[in-house]
């Protein structure tokens, strides 16, 4: 994308201005079919399937590169272990032991049966301040379609508008509407111990 190419150009210029060879300080995360895959402009290339979006692909090579560089490969390995545990939970046929399925069913009910057009995700931790944006990308990009997987138009709402902020930020802004406004907005409170 233009944004990625602009960022790459900025970093290459900064490295060059510092007297460094960019090809010895930059890596590429791309698909194996990309021209970048065989480029000598990078120290190494890590591959991901071309159908995986990069912005929040935390378990792909995109997330692996960032998390490993920032926190070490051991932390990324632990992250993948946690994701694998969640994958195992999502295969449970008992909806009450499958949090992902339960959340999905509640979301479909709220949007398609009750007709609520939005959902607020309210994490009560500043460390999770970008979590609503993560869910926006996962849910709204995937469900933001007017056709099904066969290209046929659909005649039902495909998903809610997801928004949110940490509780302490939202308390003095949109919480007013949530508490005293005329619309019903489903809320998802996120906490941790």
What do these predicted ranges mean?
Residues 7-193:
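Active-site phosphate/pyrophosphate-binding segments
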Residues 2-6:
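Glycine/threonine-rich flexible loop motifs
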